[in-house]
Amino acid sequence: MSVQELSHPLIKDGWFREINNMWPGQAMTLKVKKVLYAGKSKYQDVLVFESETYGHVLVLDGAIQATERDEFSYQEMIAHLALNSHPNPKKVLVIGGGDGGVLREVVKHECVEEAILCDIDEDVIKVSKQYLPEMSAGFNHPKVKVHIGDGFKFLQDYQNTFDVIITDSSDPDGPAEALFQKPYFQLLSDALRGGGVITTQAECMWIHLGVISNVLTAVKTVFPNVRYAYTTIPTYPSGSIGFVVASKDASIDLSKPLRKWSPEEENKLCKYYNSEIHAASFVLPTFARDVVDKATSS
């Protein structure tokens, strides 16, 4: 099926343009080889296309969520920064992450006994299973359970249950807005066991320092141990995205993994993450460090 036969308003002259108010004055463009899916779920616009250079691309409400070429740098970091900051994570919850990529990373940890994913949009899961098989492979693992529903409401039913909770959300200008505010972080804390760890998607230091500061301030009112890390990823705005990493254990250094794979295991399991980059991801440029330090100091 050609671009002309199945298209989308953001694709013009064979190019996808990521124009969004969250990053005004700039846009990522990718050359489109073939539109694979274009539709609207109950919650958002869903687009999948085959690009010339980045493989299959998942786009929600006009914003790139994942591409086959670079998705691993995000999925690995948001998962392993949290999981390797916990001494023995057995029960893990993923909020969002309907493409399955974070689940794929979670089940690489043999100590994990159960991984639950809660995503509000079943269509994203269905589309990902069809068009993003390498990412959605996580859904096939026997340790995985899937719940379709609102993550905020899901958490209200759980107390002292999970060792690690990973929030793989879209940007805070749509259905994920509530996942960037203090009441949500309180629910996360309540749902964690002692020593529990969270990671959450926390935007880009180059264009969202105000958002990052507000999120860190909110998390710090709930968790005693809060840090900010980042990864590089070409198809996200300005080429990087950050994570809030927080623990209920005030004594641990989140920049130093409590558990490590051997170098051989790391090379086999991961394309981006390793124990050295775990530590390095918390080292911030001065302009960002100053904002982060101010938001997390108490």
From Swiss-Prot:
It catalyses: S-adenosyl 3-(methylsulfanyl)propylamine + putrescine = S-methyl-5'-thioadenosine + spermidine + H(+). Belongs to the spermidine/spermine synthase family. NCBIfam families: PRK00811.1, speE. GO terms for molecular function: spermidine synthase activity. S-adenosyl 3-(methylsulfanyl)propylamine binds at Q44, Q75, D99, D119, D150, G151, D168. Pathway: Amine and polyamine biosynthesis; spermidine biosynthesis; spermidine from putrescine: step 1/1. Residues 13-248 form the PABS domain. GO terms for cellular component: cytosol; nucleus. HAMAP family: Spermidine_synth. This is Spermidine synthase. It comes from the Eukaryota. The active site is at D168 (proton acceptor). Its EC number is 2.5.1.16.
